[in-house]
C-alpha cells in the first residue's frame, strides 16, 4: 500500500525535489491528502514545471535514472519502477454518475423555488383535508403540476446538454499503443503504458512520442507541437540544450506529440500524469466550472421573488390572525400567497427561450453544450483567443518573395490574378526551380480535381506551403520534378540548417547537374559568392549583402518564417553523367553558390477574422491573443487582424521611435503590450492585473497552459466576463476556467471540445460574433419575457389578498392560475424570444453583471405595481360585474365568504332576495374564476404587445414583424375560447361558459396599458439619463 500511496502523491505534486529527484519531493507531500488540500494542489499545478533534465549531461542523466545511454535500464529495475510509479497512462478522475447529472438539472435556482412551492401546496392540502375543505384537491393538483414542470424541464435540459465533461478520457486518444524500448541492451516492442523513467526508447517518423523524452541522438527529427504549444511550424528536435525552459529547448520531446520525420533515440524522463500533457489534463479536470452569468441572474431573481413572497405572506398571515382566523387557517392563507407569488411558467419560458437560441446558433455552425452558455456569450467583455487554428488557418502559406532586390507579395489564389511580379523573369524561374526541386513534400495521389489550397500533402508545413505555391505558379510541380531527376540529397538537420539536393537537367543535350539548396537565410548566404539579379550572376559584394540584410529583417519583422534559396551548375568535366555523389564524403561543392532569393511564409489569418475583431471592438469587447507561438509572429498576426490596432505602439516600439532605452518609457503611454511566457513567469498576479488594466491591446506569446489559465483568472479578477477560444490540448484548462469556453469543431482536439461550452463547427472566429449578437439579443428578450411573465402574478395574487382581508367569494382558483401560467401565457412569452433587436446591439458596450441585472428594480416595480395593478383592476371590475349581473352587488359580497363557503347553507339570499343553494353558488364561483381568467388574458395580449420593445415605440418596431408572436396571440385567444365553451370543462377544470359582454369589460384596461406604456417609452426616449429614464426604463 505504501507504494500505491506514493504513486498517487507523485502524480499530484508533479515537481522535483531539491536534488532534482522527483520521488523525494513526492514523499514530503505524503500527509497532504484530503479535500482540504484540493485548492493547494490546483495552485501547485498552475506553477511551471521545474525540471532540469534538458540541462544535464548524458552521464548525469545515467546517474540520476540509474540507466545506460546505450543499453537502457535493466529489466528488474524497470519492473520496480513500474510498481513504484504505476503505468504510463493518464489517470482518469472519478466520473459523475448520470443520476447526479440529472439531479443537478432539478436543483437550480428556479427549480428549488418551485420545489418549495410544491411542498407548501402539499402541506396546505394536508391541513385542508384534515378540516374537510372542499378546495383541498386544488392544492394537490397545483403541487403535482409544479413537480411535473420541474421534472419535464429538467429532462429537457438533461437531453440538451452533452454528457458530462470528462477531460482526461479524451486524452486517452493521444496515448500511443506501442513503443520501441532498449533494456539490457536488447531492443523490443512493448505497450507504451509499460514505459518507466530511465527507459531508452527509439522513435521514427509517423510515431507518437510515448512519454516525455530527453533526446540523446537525432537525425532530421521534426515534431508537430501545434496542439500543445500553438506553434504551426514543425519543431526540430536534437540532443543540444537550446533554452533554459524545458518547453522551449529542442532536446525534450513531449508525450503524445507527433513525429513528422527523422529518427531519434532518448531517455524517458516523465511518464503518465507527470508528463506535460498529463499535467495539463490534471489541471483541466481540476478546474471547477464557474457559474454562468444567467445562473447568477436567476439566483438573484429567485432571492427577490422569495423575499417578496415571504414578506407578503407574513404580512397577510398577521392580518388574518388579527381579524380572527385560526392559526391553521391563517397558515393556509400564508402558503397560498407564497405559491401565488411563484411564477410557475417562468422556468419553462427561460428553458425554451434558451433552447430556441441554441437551435438558431446551431444553424450558424455554433453548437451549444450548456443552454446557459447561450446568454453568457452575449455578456462577454473579454475574448482570450488562441492564435493557431483559431485566428489563423493553421496552414503555412507563402506570403512574400524577395528577388531582383524587390519584395513581392505572393498570390496564392488559383487564378494567380494578383501576382505582382513578372513570371518570365530569369531570376524568378531560377528561384522557382530551387523551391520546387529542393522539396521533399508530395501531393497525395488522386487529387487532380481538388483545388490546390485544399489538397492533402505528405510533408511538413513549410515544404507543403512551397509545394502548393509552386503548383499554383508552375502548373504541375510533380511533373516538373520528374524532368529533373534527383541523384543525391542531404536532408535538413539542426547542425547544417540547410537542405541540399542535386539533379540532372531536363535538356538531354545538357549533361550538367544542378545543385539546389534551401535553409536558414544567413547559413545559405554564407555559402554563396554571387547573387542572381535579372538572370545575371553578380558578385555578392557588401552592397548586395546589405540589400539581403534589409530584406531579411523586413520579412522577419512581419513575423514570417524566412528561407533562403541558392543554386550552382556543376561542370560536366568534374561531375560527368553517372558521377557517384556521396553525401558522407561530400564529394561536391557546398560553397561558391549563387543566391537566388528569399521566400517567407506565415500561417495566415482567416479572411473573416479582421472584420470579426472590428465588430468585437465596436461592441466593446476586448480581444486578447494568447498563444504559444513566437512573440514576433504573434504580434504580426495581432496587428494584421486588428487586435493591435493601426497606430498603437508597444513600449518597445516607443523606445525604438524615440531612440531611448525601454526602461525610460512610461508604460502607460503604450496602448499595446506583448508579453512572453518568460516575462509572465516572473510577474506576480497583481502585476499581471495591472498590465491588463493599463494596456487595452494585449498579446501573450510563448505561454504555457498554466499561464493561459492564470491570464483568464486575472481578467476575471478585473470583473470581466471571459470567453476563451482554442483548439489545442494546451487550451483545455483555460477553456474550462472561462465563463464560456469556445472550441474549434474541425481542428479542435477532443480535450478542447470536452472542456468547452460551445463548439464552432466551421472553426470560424467570426461565428463568435454571431454568438455574441444572439446572446445579447436573448438577454434583452428574456428580460421582456420575464417582465411579461411577472406582470400577471399581481392579478393572480390580489384575489387571494382580497379573499382574505375583505372576505369576498374567491375570485380566482388554483387550477385556473395553472392554466394561465402553463398553458395560455407560455406561447406569447416564448414568442418574445423571436423579437428582433430594437437597435444595433453590437454597438453597445457589454452589460455590467453587477449593474445590468436580468430582473432589476424598475422591471419589478413596473411589472408588479403599474401594469400588474391595472390588470388587477380589470380583473376585479369584470368579477364584480359578473357577480352583480347574477344578483350579488359589490357591497353584499364584502364579508360574504363564510356563508358562501358553508356547504350546509342551502338558502343564501342575494341582493334581490333570491335564494342560492351551495351547488348554485359553486357554479357561480367557477363562473367568476373564468371571468377573472379571461380578464387577465385580454390584458396580457396588451402586455405582450408592449413588451415587444423597452425603449422604442411599438409602432416603430412593427406589430407584425414577429409572426410567431401574432400566432401566439391568436392561439391564446383560441385556448381561452376552448376552455370557456368546450363541453365538460366545468366538471374537469372548473371553467364555465360566460357571457360575451364579460369579454369586453377588460378591453379598456388593455388599451390603457398600451397607451400608458407608450407614454413611458416616449419619456425614456426624450429624456435620457433623467429620473424618468432611470426609474421607468428596465
From Swiss-Prot:
Q: What are the positions of the active site?
A: 386
Q: Where does K(+) bind?
A: 339-340, 342, 344, 796, 821
Q: What is the effect of changing residue 804 to S?
A: Has potassium-dependent ATPase activity
Q: How does it sit in the membrane?
A: Multi-pass membrane protein
Segments traversing the membrane: 98-118, 142-162, 299-318, 331-348, 783-802, 813-833, 854-876, 929-948, 963-981, 997-1017
- Outcome of swapping residue 821 to Q: Has potassium-independent constitutive ATPase activity
Provide the catalytic activity annotation: K(+)(out) + ATP + H2O + H(+)(in) = K(+)(in) + ADP + phosphate + 2 H(+)(out)
- Where on the chain is Phosphoserine found, per UniProt? 27, 462, 600, 839, 953
Region described as Disordered:
13-40, 222-244
Sites of the modification Phosphotyrosine? 7, 10
Q: Which domain of life is it from?
A: Eukaryota
Enzyme Commission number(s)? 7.2.2.19
Protein name stated in the entry = Potassium-transporting ATPase alpha chain 1
Species for this entry: Sus scrofa
Amino acid at each position: 500500500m505504501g507504494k500505491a500511496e506514493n504513486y498517487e502523491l507523485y502524480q499530484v505534486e508533479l515537481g522535483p525535489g531539491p536534488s532534482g529527484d522527483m520521488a523525494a519531493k513526492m514523499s514530503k507531500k505524503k500527509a497532504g491528502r484530503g479535500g482540504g488540500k484540493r485548492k493547494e494542489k490546483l495552485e501547485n499545478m498552475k506553477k511551471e514545471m521545474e525540471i532540469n533534465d534538458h540541462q544535464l549531461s548524458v552521464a548525469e542523466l545515467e546517474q540520476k535514472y540509474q540507466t545506460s545511454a546505450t543499453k537502457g535500464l535493466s529489466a528488474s529495475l524497470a519492473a520496480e519502477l513500474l510498481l513504484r510509479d504505476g503505468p504510463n497512462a493518464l489517470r482518469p478522475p472519478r466520473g459523475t454518475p448520470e443520476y447526479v447529472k440529472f439531479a443537478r438539472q432539478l436543483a437550480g435556482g428556479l427549480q428549488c423555488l418551485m420545489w418549495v412551492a410544491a411542498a407548501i401546496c402539499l402541506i396546505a392540502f394536508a391541513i385542508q383535508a384534515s378540516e374537510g375543505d372542499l378546495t383541498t384537491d386544488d392544492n394537490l393538483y397545483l403541487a403535482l403540476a409544479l413537480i411535473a414542470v420541474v421534472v419535464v424541464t429538467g429532462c429537457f435540459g438533461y437531453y440538451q446538454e452533452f454528457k458530462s465533461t470528462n477531460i482526461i478520457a479524451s486524452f486517452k486518444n493521444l496515448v500511443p499503443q506501442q513503443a520501441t524500448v532498449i533494456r539490457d541492451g536488447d531492443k523490443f516492442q512493448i505497450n507504451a503504458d509499460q514505459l518507466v523513467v530511465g527507459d531508452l526508447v527509439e522513435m521514427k517518423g509517423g510515431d507518437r512520442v510515448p512519454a516525455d523524452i530527453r533526446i540523446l541522438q537525432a537525425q532530421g527529427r521534426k515534431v508537430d507541437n501545434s496542439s500543445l504549444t500553438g506553434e504551426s511550424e514543425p519543431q526540430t528536435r536534437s540532443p543540444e540544450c537550446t533554452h533554459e525552459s524545458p518547453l522551449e529547448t529542442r532536446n525534450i520531446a513531449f508525450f503524445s506529440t507527433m513525429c513528422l520525420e527523422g529518427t531519434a533515440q532518448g531517455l524517458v524522463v516523465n511518464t503518465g500524469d507527470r508528463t506535460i500533457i498529463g499535467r495539463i489534463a490534471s489541471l483541466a479536470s481540476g478546474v471547477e466550472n464557474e457559474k454562468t452569468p444567467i445562473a447568477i441572474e436567476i439566483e438573484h431573481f429567485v432571492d427577490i421573488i422569495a423575499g417578496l413572497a415571504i414578506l407578503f405572506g407574513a404580512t397577510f398571515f398577521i392580518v388574518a390572525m388579527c381579524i380572527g382566523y385560526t392559526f391553521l387557517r391563517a397558515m393556509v392563507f400564508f402558503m397560498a400567497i407564497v405559491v401565488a407569488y411563484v411564477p410557475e411558467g417562468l422556468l419553462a419560458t427561460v428553458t425554451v427561450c434558451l433552447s430556441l437560441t441554441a437551435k438558431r446558433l446551431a444553424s450558424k455552425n455554433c453548437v451549444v453544450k450548456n443552454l446557459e452558455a447561450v446568454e453568457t456569450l452575449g455578456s462577454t467583455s473579454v475574448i482570450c483567443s488562441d492564435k493557431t487554428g483559431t485566428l489563423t488557418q493553421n496552414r503555412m502559406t507563402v506570403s512574400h518573395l524577395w528577388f531582383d532586390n524587390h519584395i513581392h507579395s505572393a498570390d496564392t489564389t488559383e487564378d494567380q490574378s494578383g501576382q505582382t511580379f513578372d513570371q518570365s523573369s530569369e531570376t524568378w524561374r531560377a528561384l522557382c526551380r530551387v523551391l520546387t526541386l529542393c522539396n521533399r513534400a508530395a501531393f497525395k495521389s488522386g487529387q487532380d480535381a481538388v483545388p490546390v489550397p485544399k489538397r492533402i500533402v505528405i510533408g511538413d508545413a513549410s515544404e507543403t506551403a512551397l509545394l502548393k505555391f509552386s503548383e499554383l505558379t508552375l502548373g504541375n510541380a510533380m511533373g516538373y520534378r520528374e524532368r529533373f531527376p534527383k541523384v543525391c540529397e542531404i536532408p535538413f538537420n539542426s547542425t547544417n540548417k540547410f537542405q541540399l539536393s542535386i539533379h540532372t537537367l531536363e535538356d538531354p543535350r545538357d549533361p550538367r547537374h544542378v545543385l539546389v539548396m534551401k535553409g536558414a537565410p544567413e547559413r545559405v548566404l554564407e555559402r554563396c559568392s554571387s547573387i542572381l539579379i535579372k538572370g545575371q550572376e553578380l558578385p555578392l559584394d557588401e552592397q548586395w549583402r546589405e540589400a539581403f540584410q534589409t530584406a531579411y529583417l523586413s520579412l522577419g519583422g512581419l513575423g514570417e518564417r524566412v528561407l533562403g534559396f541558392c543554386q550552382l551548375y556543376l561542370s560536366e568535366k568534374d561531375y560527368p553523367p553517372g558521377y557517384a555523389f556521396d553525401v558522407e564524403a561530400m564529394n561536391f561543392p557546398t560553397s561558391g553558390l549563387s543566391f537566388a532569393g528569399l521566400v517567407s511564409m506565415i500561417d495566415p489569418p482567416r479572411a473573416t477574422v479582421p472584420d470579426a475583431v472590428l465588430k468585437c471592438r465596436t461592441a466593446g469587447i476586448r480581444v486578447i491573443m494568447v498563444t504559444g507561438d513566437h512573440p514576433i509572429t504573434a504580434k504580426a498576426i495581432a496587428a494584421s487582424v486588428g487586435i493591435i490596432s493601426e497606430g498603437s505602439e508597444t513600449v518597445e516600439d516607443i523606445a525604438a521611435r524615440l531612440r531611448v532605452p525601454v526602461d525610460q518609457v512610461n508604460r502607460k503611454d503604450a496602448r499595446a503590450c506583448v508579453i512572453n511566457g518568460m516575462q509572465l513567469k516572473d510577474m506576480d498576479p497583481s502585476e499581471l492585473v495591472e498590465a491588463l488594466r493599463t494596456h487595452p491591446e494585449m498579446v501573450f506569446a510563448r505561454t504555457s497552459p498554466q499561464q493561459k489559465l492564470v491570464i483568464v483568472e486575472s481578467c476575471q479578477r478585473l470583473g470581466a466576463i471571459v470567453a476563451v477560444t482554442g483548439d489545442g490540448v494546451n487550451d483545455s484548462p483555460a477553456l474550462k476556467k472561462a465563463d464560456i469556453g469556445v472550441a474549434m469543431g474541425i481542428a479542435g482536439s477532443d480535450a478542447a471540445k470536452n472542456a468547452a461550452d460551445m463548439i464552432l463547427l466551421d472553426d470560424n472566429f467570426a461565428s463568435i460574433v454571431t454568438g455574441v449578437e444572439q446572446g445579447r439579443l436573448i438577454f434583452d428578450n428574456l428580460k421582456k419575457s420575464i417582465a411579461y411573465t411577472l406582470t400577471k402574478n399581481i392579478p393572480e395574487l390580489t384575489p387571494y389578498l382580497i379573499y382574505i382581508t375583505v372576505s369576498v367569494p374567491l375570485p380566482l382558483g388554483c387550477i385556473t392560475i395553472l392554466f394561465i401560467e402553463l398553458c395560455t401565457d407560455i406561447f406569447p412569452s416564448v414568442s418574445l424570444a423571436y423579437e428582433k433587436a430594437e437597435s444595433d446591439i453590437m454597438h453597445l458596450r457589454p452589460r455590467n453583471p453587477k449593474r445590468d441585472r436580468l430582473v432589476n428594480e424598475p422591471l419589478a416595480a413596473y411589472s408588479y405595481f403599474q401594469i400588474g395593478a391595472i390588470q388587477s383592476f380589470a380583473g376585479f371590475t369584470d368579477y364584480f360585474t359578473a357577480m352583480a349581473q347574477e344578483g350579488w352587488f359589490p357591497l353584499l359580497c364584502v364579508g360574504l365568504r363564510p356563508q358562501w363557503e358553508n356547504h350546509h347553507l342551502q338558502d343564501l339570499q342575494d341582493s334581490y332576495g333570491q335564494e342560492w343553494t351551495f351547488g348554485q353558488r359553486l357554479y357561480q364561483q367557477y363562473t367568476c374564476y373564468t371571468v377573472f381568467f379571461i380578464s387577465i388574458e385580454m390584458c396580457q395580449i396588451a402586455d405582450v404587445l408592449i413588451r415587444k420593445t423597452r425603449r422604442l415605440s411599438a409602432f416603430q418596431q412593427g406589430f407584425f414583424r414577429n409572426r410567431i408572436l401574432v400566432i401566439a396571440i391568436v392561439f391564446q385567444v383560441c385556448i381561452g375560447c376552448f376552455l370557456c365553451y368546450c363541453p365538460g370543462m366545468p366538471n374537469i377544470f372548473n371553467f364555465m361558459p360566460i357571457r360575451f359582454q364579460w369579454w369586453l369589460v377588460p378591453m379598456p384596461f388593455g388599451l390603457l396599458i398600451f397607451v400608458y406604456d407608450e407614454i413611458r417609452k416616449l419619456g425614456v426616449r426624450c429624456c435620457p439619463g433623467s429620473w424618468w429614464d432611470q426609474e421607468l426604463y428596465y
